[in-house]
Amino acid sequence: MSAAILLAPGDVIKRSSEELKQRQIQINLVDWMESEGGKEDKTEPKEESKAEGSKDGEGTQSESGQKEEGGKETKDADVDRRIHTAVGSGSGTKGSGERANENANRGDGKVGGGGGDADAGVGATGTNGGRWVVLTEEIARAIESKYGTKIDVYRDEVPAQIIEVERSLQKELGISREGVAEQTERLRDLRRKEKNGTHAKAVERGGRKQRKKAHGDAQREGVEEEKTSEEPARIGITIEGVMSQKKLLSMIGGVERKMAPIGARESAVMLVSNSIKDVVRATAYFTAPTGDPHWKEVAREASKKKNILAYTSTGGDVKTEFLHLIDHL
């Protein structure tokens, strides 16, 4: 696509203005506060004009999006149903085995008292090797996407060290309601099992005391050996609630990923605008829930154009999705 002009809601453009300037993209923003008083379109000064030439090797993908004429008026969220392109970029996940292999040598000193290998940790036995795990695939994906650290999902192994992602961190990671509910359900199941396991251990210990009295001192050593050999296998599950990003990173390692902005020469977008005057020359538009009262009319007019690409927010972070779209048009 050459010299693309992208329409978007005014508040989305406002929140992204700094990143747009870094990309040397012009901004034509109609401020709805001022436009109420009859002011005309306000164009923010551009840092550097974008060269208006077509890019080689990339043809315009035209997805015909004309709505049937005769028509019913549509709301913001509906104007682009004819072309619904998911903007967000999900991070693919690998199997838990791969994550386990890659994390085995992390040696951050936070797990099982370990230094290097996972097997070096005190009590770090079983399939999990003593490393921290989470309860859902969604949480594992979110952590990998945000911090670049692969983390296993709990698979009913014992012993286990489980991270419970609490409310403030759930928001930070962008965990969905379904993901939160799934974690809550798994925690309830675990606590129920843990309670039953503790009861079984108490019964077994009582039985050992009776056996010791019955058989006397001669068999005391054998009973003690039995006790010490059986109890490590019954070491239960550690659940650690985590509210802050800092604590999470201290447990799993990694740092927050910050995407470097794509430069002007790498983006096809020349101008972003929320002005109805730019509908005629627009090549694409992005719609999302907005407080811009004029966007409904702009989007409706844009939807009447032939050969215009329509994109909509998938419900995640709107600014991130908007910039991702700009960088990949």
Curated annotation (Swiss-Prot):
Residues 110-129 have a biased composition (Gly residues). Changing residue 205 to Q: Complete loss of ATP hydrolysis activity and RNA binding activity. GO terms for cellular component: viral capsid. It comes from the Viruses. It is found in: Virion. Its main location: virion. Its EC number is 3.6.4.13. It catalyses: ATP + H2O = ADP + phosphate + H(+). InterPro entries: Orbi_VP6. It is an enzyme of class 3 (hydrolase). Keywords: ATP-binding, Hydrolase, Nucleotide-binding, Virion. ATP binds at residue 110. Changing residue 157 to N: No effect on ATP hydrolysis activity or ATP binding. It holds the Pfam family Orbi_VP6. One of its GO terms (molecular function) is ATP binding. Residues 28-130, 189-232 are annotated as: Disordered. Residues 36-58, 65-83, 96-109, 189-207, 215-232 have a biased composition (Basic and acidic residues). Homohexamer. ATP dependent RNA helicase essential for RNA packaging and viral transcription. Possesses ss- and dsRNA-binding capacity. Belongs to the reoviruses VP6 family. This is Helicase VP6-A.
